[in-house]
Structures are given as C-alpha cells and as structure tokens.
Amino acid sequence: MGNFFGRQRNAYVRVSLPAVCFVWQIAMIILFGVFIRYNEESDAHWVEHKKTNNITSDIENDFYYRYPSFQDVHVMIFVGFGFLMTFLKRYSFGGVGFNFLIAAFGIQWALLMQGWFHFLDHSTGKIYIGVENLINADFCVAGSLIAYGALLGKVSPVQLLVLTLFGVTLFAVEEYIILHLLHCRDAGGSMVIHAFGGYYGLGISWVLYRPNLHQSKRLHGSVYHSDVFAMIGTLFLWMFWPSFNSAITDHGDGQHRAAINTYLGLASCVLTTVALSSMHDKRGRLDMVHIQNATLAGGVAMGTAAEFMISPYGALIVGFCCGIISTFGYLYVTPFLEKYLKLQDTCGVHNLHAVPGMLGGFVGAIVAAAATESVYSKEGLINTFNFEGKYADRSVGTQGGYQAAGTCVAVAFGLVGGAIVGFILKFPIWGDPADDNCFDDEAYWEVPEDEETIPPVLEYNNHMIHKHQDIAETNFSVEQS
C-alpha cells in the first residue's frame, strides 16, 4: 500500500478532467430534471398566488428582498475568494480559475443536497427553489472554497472536484444536524461554514502531507503585483461581509443588527491586525499576509452572534480579539503546525477560518446563554432564537449549550470528514502535481510565454516559514551583483 501511494505523480488530466466534468454535469442535468422546480415566487403561477393571498404588489416577492444580499454573497464567492488566492507568484490562474470551477459545480450539487435535507416536498417529491436557495447554495460551496485554501497549489482540478463533491455532501449533513436537530442559530456560518470548511481542508492537507514540498520552495511565495491582486479579493470580502452574515436572517431587526455587528467587528479587526503586524517587524513595517487575511477574521467570528444582541462594543471586542488571534496564528501557529504536526496550510485557513469560526461558535453560545428578557423582550427572545413549537420551552442556558455542541459537531465533521476524503484523494489516479511542480500554473494551464522577468529585488517569499531570512538573503545577493 505504501508503494501504491508513493507512485510517481503525473499531472496529466486530459482524459480525467473532461470525463469528470462531462459526466457530473450530465448527472446534474438529469437530477435537476427529476427533482428541481421553481417555487411559488419564481413560477409563472405567481400572478394567481398574488390574487389568492391578496398581494397587491410584486415588491412582496422574495426576489426583491433577498437579491441585493445574493449579489453581494455571489461576488464574495467568485471574486472575493478567487482573488484572495492569487497571491502566489506563479499560481494566479489556478487560484482564481479553480475557485471558479469549484463554485460552479458546487452550487449545483448544493441546491440538490440542501434541497433533499431542507426543502423537499414529500407530497410531490420535488425541491422548489427560489433566490434564498441560491444564497444557501453559495454558503454551502464556501466551505469547499475554504478547504481549497489549505491545499492551494498542491492538488489537481480533478481532486478539487472530488473534494467539492464530498465537501458539499458533508456540509449538508452537518448543517442539518446543527440547524435542525440541535436547533442552533448560525446566520453567518461561523460554525457550519468557517469552522467546518477550515478543518475540512486541514484534515485533507494533513493526510496529503508532502515531505518534499521544499522542492517547490522557489514558487511558494508572492511578488508585488500578485499581492496587489490578492488585496482586491480581501477588499471585496471585507466590504460585503455584512451582507454575508445578514443574508438569510429574519426580516427586520435581526438582519439590521447582523449587518451592524459584522461591520463593527471587521473594522476593529483591521486596526488590531495592523498594530500587531507592525509590532512584529523590527522596523515597524506591515506584512501583506496579515493585512490580506487576518483583517477578515472579525467577520468570520461574528457570523453566529451577528443577529444576537451582543451590543456594538461587544462586536468591537470580538473583532479586536480575532485580530490578535489570527495575526499570532500566521506568525507562530502555522510554522508550528507544519514543523511538528506535518500540516501544510498554503493560505493559512487555520488562522482565518478554522479558529475564528470555532471562536465565533463559542461566542454565540455565551451570548445566547446570557440573553435576558430585559435586553431582548419576551417576543424578541422568541423571534431571535426561534423558541417556537417543540422548542417553546427551551431556556437560553440550554440554547447556549446546544450552540456550543453545534460548534463541536462542525469541527468534528471537518476533521474526520477531511481525513477520510484525504485518503480518497491520496490515490495516485487524480493527476496531482509532483513535489517540484507545485504552485506552478504550467502544470494545468497554458501560460503566456512573453512574460517579463521579475527582478529579484521585487520578489519575496511571503506566506512561508523563515521568509524574513529568505528576504535578507535575496536582498544581499542583489546588492552584491
């Protein structure tokens, strides 16, 4: 078995990639034909529905309420996540292009998986979809995109499609357990999206550990313009994160509050990150790794508690703490994990998604357990935590306990599911790149030949362990030449 897994890698995907894409897309067409239908607000019978329910205006259609949030979330998925992964000096095509591939396949599979768990009409056997389903599908595929961040530059597009197939499936199951069986509240997905997606990617990366990855060390870094492109992704994510955390919250005060809390958490996180990044450098200079990534951790951590009455200063505290935790993670935890736990995390998703997501889940548990009628009002408590039906007698303390349990479920699903999927992806049939060919677009993309040679002085081995030592060596060699 060891010899089987240790066979020579071959990045040839001319047969496997078209085959997987064609077969799975045809399967989607068939499954959509069998199961998927328009819901009453997107069906042509909407006119009759308006008359029956005394609706006088099309403005009551959910499209006009949800679509602005859907637009923002959609931009985050395709532009924000995509460009955030373009920091590698020779892997920008793969960063944004494979992000596009994962998302395009994942949203189709997510509409089916989430539909079977949440929206299946048992009387007809059909799944009826509208604009809210599109938002949820984007949320679902976000978990797989986060996992991709841990594997960036080290896997083939076929492996990424397999990762997405299992990732969306696992997401739908853990989401059903957390939101329906445990009755947790997680509007912005700190638990179900970020904690799960982060640990899912880390679990896969741990199994796919490459002891000879140093052979691609020359490409495991950024250049000036690649970091600028990555910063574009950061800014899109940062600007639209309030929409992400509030997109599927209840109409009214909950959605309004979620946007405010996220807005403040993000702002606080930026200042904290800048302060720590500057403190770490002897000359007070800022590190783009921290600015691109750790500045977003506040939005991740505010996901669960976004619609709760955490208060504006509470949101600032969460962002402040996440800025510290995430920046320290990039400085010290990521090198530790690679050296001692053999965990290679290209984008540092452990610091941006996994830990802040887990922290956000526990923050939500504490805030839920501390909720009182004097702060929320009786009706406000019922509405915020959905204490209705069989949950009408649930206390806030019990709700806090279930919120904490939901966080543990998300982490467990991510780690265990990631390890299992990692073993599947370890089979040498997926066309993954050799150790000396990682982080290089030429393995899977036609790269223009007329690229200008980048002067060594503009290169710096960012997103790497011992990078400061490498910078010093590079600068020294340039000065001597």
Curated annotation (Swiss-Prot):
Residues 1-15, 89-92, 154-159, 209-227, 280-288, 338-351, 426-481 are cytoplasmic. One of its GO terms (molecular function) is ammonium channel activity. Specifically expressed in the gill by pavement cells (at protein level). Keywords: Ammonia transport, Cell membrane, Glycoprotein, Membrane, Transmembrane, Transmembrane helix, Transport. It is found in: Apicolateral cell membrane. Belongs to the ammonium transporter (TC 2.A.49) family. Rh subfamily. Homotrimer. The chain crosses the membrane at residues 16-36, 68-88, 93-113, 133-153, 160-180, 188-208, 228-248, 259-279, 289-311, 315-337, 352-372, 405-425. This is Ammonium transporter Rh type C 2. GO terms for biological process: ammonium homeostasis. Residues 37-67, 114-132, 181-187, 249-258, 312-314, 373-404 are extracellular. It is a multi-pass membrane protein. Functions as an ammonia transporter. May play a role in the elimination of ammonia in the gill.
